[in-house]
Every structure is written in structure tokens, then in C-alpha cells.
């Protein structure tokens, strides 16, 4: 059984699901799905924030920033990123739509907490970036750090297009690599201080991907869920590892698996094992 470190601060009591009179569907296409609104004339005189509905909760944002404080400049970049994600979510599945009311705590704060585990890291690689968690969030936070860089590795063309737009509008120090993870790792020659992945693959597979980077000095931080203990047990069949497991500052069953050293135990490697060979 691996020891779990519990964070010092408790999750803010204000963290809760956004509720109220908004419709269940976060993207209503007809005015009559809005409670009490029968036609467009009823929108006259309403405030701009009401006309521009966002499924994300202001209360949830406040709770997230209480957990993982950032500068006003970083907050502005994150706001732009969140707005873009909400727009793209209607046509590209970037996150589970059910998590949008808790996007700031569930995704933003969950990503930002990695910075505290690698405070000296400037050069990051995020494998399987998808909707940009944690990669784009980290890039937004590192934008004012001289020499900072985040490589966003994603093989899905639509998601890579979203990532490029997110990097552009936030002016963050990140670059998008449209390729398989294995190809990126094999071709990577630049320095990597920390490599990350979130909701991507089982640990034994992730370790196979990042082994070359970790053996060059990178730290690996993987955002995992309730199955982390079972994944660690399976990973020890292929790897000699001494992981440090941290509880997520956002509460719940989230965990962060940290690795500074990876030693291969099975010559086949975990990549092949995952494919069933």
C-alpha cells in the first residue's frame, strides 16, 4: 500500500455545483427554453452578463482561485481560455459537459496545483493535452516566467486546432505538437523539466512513454483518480518505482502520482503490454 499525503488546506466550503434558474441544457438554442423568457423583446434592458450566458459558475471560480491563487494577469489569461473552451465545447468534446459548472475547481485548480510540486520547472511537456488540462493552464500561469515553455502533445487534429487557438488568444509560451506521444518522446531533444498527463492511460503505459524523459532528469506528474492504487500495483509488474502520491487540493478522490526515477523491469515495456502483446 502506497502512502498518501494529505494537503494542508481544506477545500473551500464554497465549492459547490452551480444551481439556480438556468436550464439543464447549458447551450439553449431557443429563447423559450429560458425560464420566464417568451420572446427576444424581453431581453431589452437586461445586463450584458445575462445575455452572454456561461455555464461556468462564478462561485466555483472564486473557490478555485482560493485553492490555487494566481496573479491578475494569469487570471485574465485563464478567463480568455475558459471562454474559448465553452465556445468550442458546442462542436468539439473537450471536457465532459456535466463538469462545466465546476470547470474552475474540477479542471483549472486541478491543473494549477502541479506548479507547487515542481516550483523550479520551466520547461514542461503535457502528453495527450486534449482540452488543455493541465498544459494550457500551466502555460497561462508560466507566461511571465522568462524561458518558460510548455509542449502540448496531441494527436487529434480538432483538439490540436483548439489548443493552437488557446495558445494564441492567451499569448502563452506553449507550442502544439500534432503527433503520437511515442513519436514526440523519441524526437524530443529540448530540455524537459517536468512531464505531465491527465486522464490519458494507465500508469504502466504512461511510465513507458516518459521513461526516456525521466531518465534525462525530468519529473513526471500524473493526475489520476480513485484507481491509482490498483494502477500502481499493476505498474510494479513492469517497473521498479518509488512513487510519491499526493491528494488533490480540490478534494474528492483525485490523486497526483509523482515519479523522479523509473527503472524498466520487463524488456517488452509497458507500451507493448498495453496492446496485449
From Swiss-Prot:
S-adenosyl-L-methionine binds at residues 128, 133, 188-189, 198. Pfam families: GidB. Its EC number is 2.1.1.170. GO terms for cellular component: cytosol. Specifically methylates the N7 position of guanine in position 527 of 16S rRNA. It catalyses: guanosine(527) in 16S rRNA + S-adenosyl-L-methionine = N(7)-methylguanosine(527) in 16S rRNA + S-adenosyl-L-homocysteine. One of its GO terms (molecular function) is rRNA (guanine-N7-)-methyltransferase activity. This is Ribosomal RNA small subunit methyltransferase G. SUPFAM superfamilies: S-adenosyl-L-methionine-dependent methyltransferases (SSF53335). Signal peptide: none annotated.
Amino acid at each position: 500500500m502506497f502512502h498518501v499525503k494529505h494537503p494542508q488546506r481544506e477545500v473551500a466550503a464554497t465549492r459547490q455545483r452551480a444551481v439556480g434558474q438556468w436550464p439543464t441544457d447549458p447551450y439553449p438554442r431557443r429563447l423559450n427554453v429560458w425560464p420566464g423568457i417568451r420572446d427576444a423583446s424581453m431581453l431589452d434592458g437586461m445586463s450584458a452578463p445575462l445575455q452572454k450566458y456561461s455555464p461556468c459558475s462564478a462561485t466555483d471560480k472564486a473557490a478555485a482561485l482560493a485553492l490555487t491563487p494566481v496573479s491578475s494577469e494569469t487570471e485574465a489569461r485563464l478567463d480568455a481560455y475558459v471562454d474559448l473552451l465553452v465556445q468550442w465545447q458546442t462542436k468539439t468534446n473537450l471536457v465532459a459537459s456535466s463538469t462545466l459548472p465546476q470547470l474552475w475547481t474540477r479542471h483549472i485548480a486541478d491543473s494549477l496545483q502541479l506548479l507547487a510540486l515542481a516550483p523550479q520547472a520551466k520547461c514542461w511537456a503535457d502528453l495527450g493535452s486534449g482540452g488543455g488540462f493541465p498544459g494550457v493552464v500551466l502555460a497561462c500561469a508560466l507566461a511571465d516566467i522568462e524561458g518558460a515553455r510548455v509542449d502540448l502533445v496531441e494527436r487529434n487534429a480538432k483538439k490540436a486546432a483548439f489548443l493552437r487557438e488557446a495558445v494564441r488568444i492567451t499569448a502563452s509560451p506553449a507550442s502544439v505538437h500534432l503527433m503520437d506521444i511515442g513519436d514526440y518522446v523519441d524526437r524530443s531533444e529540448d530540455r524537459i523539466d517536468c512531464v505531465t498527463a491527465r486522464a490519458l492511460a494507465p500508469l504502466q503505459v504512461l511510465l513507458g512513454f516518459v521513461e526516456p524523459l525521466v531518465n534525462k532528469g525530468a519529473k513526471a506528474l500524473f493526475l489520476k483518480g480513485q484507481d491509482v492504487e490498483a494502477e500502481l500495483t499493476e505498474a510494479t509488474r513492469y517497473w521498479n518505482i518509488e512513487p510519491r502520491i499526493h491528494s488533490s487540493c480540490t478534494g474528492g478522490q483525485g490523486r497526483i502520482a509523482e515519479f523522479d526515477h523509473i527503472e524498466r523491469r520487463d524488456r517488452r515495456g509497458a507500451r507493448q503490454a498495453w496492446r496485449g502483446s
